[in-house]
Amino acid sequence: MGIYLNPDSSKFEEAVNSDIYVDKTGLLAYTNSVLHTMQKYICVSRPRRFGKSTAANMLTAYYSRGCAAGQLFSRFEIAKNSAFKQYLNQYNTISVNMQEILSRSHSIYELIERFSKLVIRDLKKEYPDVDYFDDTDVIECMQDVYSQKKQAFVVILDEWDCIFREYKEDKAAQEKYLDFLRDVLKDKAYIHLAYMTGILPIKKYGTHSALNMFDEFSMIDPGPLAEYVGFTEAEVRMLCEQYQMDITEVKCWYDGYSFENEISIYSPRSVVSCMRFKKIGNYWNQTETFEALRIYIDMNFEGLKDDVLSMIAGNTVPVNIGNFSNDMSTFHFEDDVLTLLIHLGYVSYDYDSKTVKIPNEEVRAEYVNSVSASEWGEVSKSLKNSADTLEAIWQKRPKQVAEAISQAHFETSHIQYNDENALSYTISLALYAARNFYVIHRELAGGKGFADLVFIPRKKFPEKPAIVVELKWDKDVDGAIAQIKNKEYCRSLEEYRGNVLLVGVNYNRKTKVHECVIEEDVIGTEIV
């Protein structure tokens, strides 16, 4: 048993022994299925807080010949798999967190040298009787062990892409690193599985990728590994039952990463913190400050500002992911920034529609923090004033509401403002603070038509009135309230009982004036 060659299972044991551990050992069934095949190269990229290192430690505990992990895995899903015992602790396993190596190195070249020396030292301790052709060359040493001992290798590289975050501009050193990994891993009989984790997909340079033998599983397309990206809906429901938390609130705050086959993924670190502390809140910024997001927002490529504001308002925006360079420094268009934000977890990607959105309220709060501290001062003012606008609706002060919407329109005047959708967008920003008290639905189906915006009080704020908003464009503002009643919008609130505020808003293009009317009604034994 060494430090990097055939380590013990202690790191995975820590995860299993924690207050909350969600069984993700089903991943091993997939890795077992590709052992010693052309599909043995796996690169998994996902954001921080999404359990990459835990998965790497799990693979280490399962494959490492330095472990006796049968009992450790016996109560988990993988133990039911027919191949469970066949591969359990049967491989020479090299497991390295590249960030740890980088932190003790002063350059990428030193990282490569240190990695080689550390692995070679463990190899020579484990196999002192091997006739090493060149005991300074890690590739030669691994080949010698394989040929003389008939022991194949599983190589697990956690945070493999750290150098692209630390050395963003050093292209020559990046290529050297990629070439080194290729030389160690590609077309080598001694490799039966290579598993790498990172935040970014594999870096491309020139006309090819040095690591083009890898299958990539990312936040854009996790493929068959989607359920292992984070916590699934079923897993979170079980935790909510165990810890007596409201699944609706948890879903609103931490869900939002959706993949094929309708797999919905929650942010695991945030869910765990929420359960442990029994409190809905923003746990994202405890591991990732909004400064990281602010850097990219302040780039403000043409169209980026519009996209960010639209997403804060709850919309989706189209994105072309095809030109992204898979690094954190090469940006030519807004799409490059948005694609990076997909990989960082700041937006979720819909593979079918090719659009992105802010996944949940926790992440949305980070956008508001970033915008408030950015150079977009005029926009942040509208967001900060949104609490006053909401209060004005509660107090039925339509003139103040109309003035606030006018101000929000002025501050986002670069947005094409020519239909009800644009008006809805502006009002969503003007009422951003409502997200603290309401579940917001846009174009909620109901009655004979649909309402533009419906605000349903969250369970913990039952004293707040529901709000139904009808948006008009060059129409009679009083007719908006009548239309709400005529179309029976409030039938959409069938399970709601209590006060409801009917809000009509109209924008007159000729006078450029916003008008607002507010009426109160009650949903009880009779429906509005």
Model-inferred region functions:
Residues 431-439, 495-497:
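Short secondary-structure junctions
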Residues 427, 451-455, 464-473, 487:
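Conserved catalytic cores of phosphodiester-cleaving nucleases, focusing on short active-site segments
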